Amino acid sequence: MKKMLVCGAGGFIGGHLVTSLKQQGHYVIGADIKQHEYKKTDADEFYQYDLREQSNVRKLITSDIDTIYQLAADMGGAGYIFTGNNDADIMHNSAMINLNIAEEMVKKGVRNVFYTSSACMYPSHNQEDPDNPLLSEESAYPANPDSEYGWEKLFSERLYMSFARNHGLRARIARLHNVFGPQGSWNNGKEKAPAALCRKVAQSTGEIEVWGPGVQTRSFLYIDECIEGIHRIQASDCGFPLNLGSERMISINGLVELISTIAKKSVKINNVPGPLGVMGRNSHNQLIHDTIGWAPQDNLEYGLEQTYAWISNMIEHNIADAKTA
């Protein structure tokens, strides 16, 4: 039995990863600034620590840990990342967490780290055409992310790779593309497009507002495929970043239509000004396929069915709780 540490275990992906690692038979320690909002953690130990504080990281990382999965970050959807109001917090908070973890790994002799980067680190000039975005791994430079969130992710990629070169860390890095599924943020201002649109459709009486023209495109990776990819990349010999996302691209208006079909509702789309991000983003999976012999499957419909059902249930419970309060 190996001892695993999941930083960010109180978050959406981290919570699912803890469960998966336990199912594999590992002893799992979870850490986060908050408890998971929607489930009781499956971790053997959970520490509610602010990982920006070096003293907390010093207590958390011990020499008997086999692998650290570093998912902890200051993050959110377009309404959080692209307004500009949170740029300093995003840069400072996430950078401090990664600097603390990398330094303490060296001090304690812990070698293995898995870092979740993001497709947000890709240059904005390669994502202006909604029909033909360029997001192959080698297109990352010259660097020009469209947000401070993306710049920090790029910095931390280089941080872990430099610690691998100079201090012997075994770093594995995945650039995640719009991961979605149950048990994630859906109504707190940090939710991403699939969850936000599932909520809007579920609450709709005929019309919903969608930020931007709706022709902007994205690909979306269901959480089960994300967790599978994390395990496969971590077990591989690949020491450079790999895309982890779906190659199926869909417009935001198209995503609304797909969710509406799943919900069996007729919904009119009202496109309004709002935080937008790039016009086109889609995973390019040739390198991950060539490197580890695997790439995510297209589970968009299935994933949206599961996510919509979960969010609808959450809405119903919130209404019921409000009536009995």
Where in the sequence are the language-model features?
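N-terminal Rossmann NAD(P)H-binding glycine-rich loop of SDR-like oxidoreductase domains
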Residues: 4-24
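C-terminal substrate-binding subdomain of Rossmann-fold SDR/epimerase-dehydratase oxidoreductases
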Residues: 20, 203-325
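Conserved glycine-rich Rossmann-like NAD(P)H-binding loop of the short-chain dehydrogenase/reductase
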Residues: 26-35
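Rossmann-fold cofactor-recognition segment
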Residues: 42-54
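NAD(P)H-binding glycine-rich loop region in Rossmannoid oxidoreductase-like domains
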Residues: 51-93, 124
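Conserved Rossmann-fold NAD(P)-dependent oxidoreductase catalytic core, especially the SDR/UDP-sugar
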Residues: 99-146, 172
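NAD(P)-dependent short-chain dehydrogenase/reductase
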Residues: 125-134, 158-234, 247-249, 257-262
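Active-site helix of classical SDR
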Residues: 148, 152
